[in-house]
């Protein structure tokens, strides 16, 4: 994941609770409700999504490249008594063996990985057969919104530590060999541009011959 603005982890940690109250808390909980079994969280950030782990999850591991974010997530997990193995890593090179997880969660992270295709290929590799890619992402909009996101993508990317607001994430997930039929668009939210609309749900690997 791109490291551009060194202050971003702290700005994110201060500002994100506001967006959580306005919008994300509800959708984080809904997205996490799709996770089961052995869960990997890619791009854990400050660990907010750990608060919404469903009973169906049996173990939790996470990769996060930013030391400040890892410290915040570890502190949150300790406060709430959550057992999680947080390791230094990036989505493009996940440090776990093949078929290690029943679910892999990406929450507001595919916008900022350096290589979306490589990240999704790695997620596919570590998912066990029948596993789920659990998704909550902001994505490129249609029409004027999409053009606006294209226009400000570069300055926004620097400001937000590599976040690109104009990524066509559902297309990338489909191209990586996932069935996107359980993903849906949330077009109207209280989150301001350029971080809207959103994509939520889960995807599974397309079976050979399907």
What is the predicted role of each segment?
Residues 18-38, 48-52:
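Conserved alpha-helix/loop element of class I SAM-dependent methyltransferases that forms part
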Residues 40-93:
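Class I SAM-dependent methyltransferase SAM/SAH-binding core
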Residues 92-104:
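A short acidic, Gly/Pro-enriched loop at the edge of an enzyme's catalytic core
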Residues 103-115:
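A short SAM/SAH-binding and catalytic strip from SAM-dependent methyltransferases
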Residues 117-129:
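A short glycine-rich, Lys/Arg-flanked "PGG" loop and its adjoining helix->strand segment in the class I
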Residues 130-138:
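Conserved beta-strand signature within the Rossmann-like core of class I S-adenosyl-L-methionine
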Residues 162-177:
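Short alpha-helix
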Residues 185-210:
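Core SAM-dependent methyltransferase catalytic element
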